[in-house]
Amino acid sequence: MGYLFTSESVSEGHPDKVADQISDAVLDKLLAYDPSSKVACETLVTTGQVVLAGEVKTKAYVDLQLIAREVIKKIGYTKGEYMFESNSCGVLSAIHEQSPDINRGVERQDPMEQGAGDQGMMFGYATNETENYMPLSLDLAHRILQVLADIRREEKVMTYLRPDAKSQVTIEYDDNGTPVRIDTIVVSTQHDDFIQPADDSAEAQLKADEEMLSIIRRDVIEILMPRVIASIHHDKVLALFNDQIVYHVNPTGKFVIGGPHGDTGLTGRKIIVDTYGGKGAHGGGAFSGKDPSKVDRSAAYAARHIAKNMVAAGVADEMLVQVSYAIGVARPINIFVDTYGRSHVNMTDGEIARVIDQLFDLRPKAIEERLKLRNPIYQETAAYGHMGREPQVVSKTFFSRYEGNKTVEVELFTWEKLDYVDKIKAAFGL
């Protein structure tokens, strides 16, 4: 008997993701001007208002208000009717200095013995069901919203689109855990009130709402989904699309009020969207707004890097890696591996974990250096998932009236590189 599995994603205009992107934009600017910055930046967004709070230790000085407004503008909240607009929203800051107690407990004379910024457990996961070693349901959910955002920015078709949106994809698997078909796709997108009722009656309003919904549903199926399918270059995934897919498009009906005006957004409230869509596991720590001394972020990236390279090397078809830390202690307390019975080596999961411990240095400073995490690389991670993205080298320019302008070349999504495959194959005799 097969089973159904579902993952969701949210767009860059979802209020929680607006908050994530602002927090990571603050982090990036501080790292651009002072790579040693210690940052924990939390953001709240609501009707006409942004509130920044958190702890920072840095030599840099940045304009927090300008950073927030630039992010909001880039996302697309540029009209007063959204009740949250880049030029007019208020921006309040309650950011203060990092606790010296924490700082003393983490920093060491030998940088390589830098302690973990907090206790906790972090997970990395990978599966070979997609080319980017991500769960298919989440990969498709992200893709749908990325294409929807492209359509919105082009302003050629579906011109009624607003920034807030969500998607959900349900995949049917067979008994062996192989995807066999796409069962259900849910798309909810914020939109303009683009059809006005003939009069003030409830009947006229209902008719106008139904006409809008009919157009949006048609456009999602006839414009959005063909572009999503065209962006997929994997024959096995393309074969999963079928005429029996159930589409739920704006199933609650009218969706004009949205974004931070519709729901308050907070940093760190989409941790499953950020990672594996419900597959694998999650230690509970959010990523955005945190510099890499916080193992919530850096160790989760390192665990993904390990799991992806292990699966790509052929050690297993699917792998979960857990690593845990004590605050102020450099070396992890444990490394745990689960191959879900899909290993291709004659070793127990515990034995595989011991080989991983020999191959990968999981001290926080070693992770920072291996994955180049002391660079301004984080705003790009804050929408459409931190995992499964394409590593790339980009040039980023930062503007500051206080520090001057600065251009840096950085490598994004380094934890997605398959740069340990050969070492792993040698270690496991593959």
Curated annotation (Swiss-Prot):
Subunit architecture: Homotetramer; dimer of dimers.
Reactions mediated catalytically: L-methionine + ATP + H2O = S-adenosyl-L-methionine + phosphate + diphosphate
Named cofactor requirement(s): Mg(2+); K(+)
Protein name as it appears in the record: S-adenosylmethionine synthase
GO biological process: one-carbon metabolic process; S-adenosylmethionine biosynthetic process
UniProt organism field: Bacteroides thetaiotaomicron (strain ATCC 29148 / DSM 2079 / JCM 5827 / CCUG 10774 / NCTC 10582 / VPI-5482 / E50)
Keyword terms: ATP-binding, Cytoplasm, Magnesium, Metal-binding, Nucleotide-binding, One-carbon metabolism, Potassium, Transferase
Any one GO CC term of the record: cytosol
Lineage of producing organism: Bacteria, Pseudomonadati, Bacteroidota, Bacteroidia, Bacteroidales
Primary localization: cytoplasm
InterPro entries: ADOMET_SYNTHASE_CS, S-AdoMet_synt_C, S-AdoMet_synt_central, S-AdoMet_synt_N, S-AdoMet_synthetase, S-AdoMet_synthetase_sfam
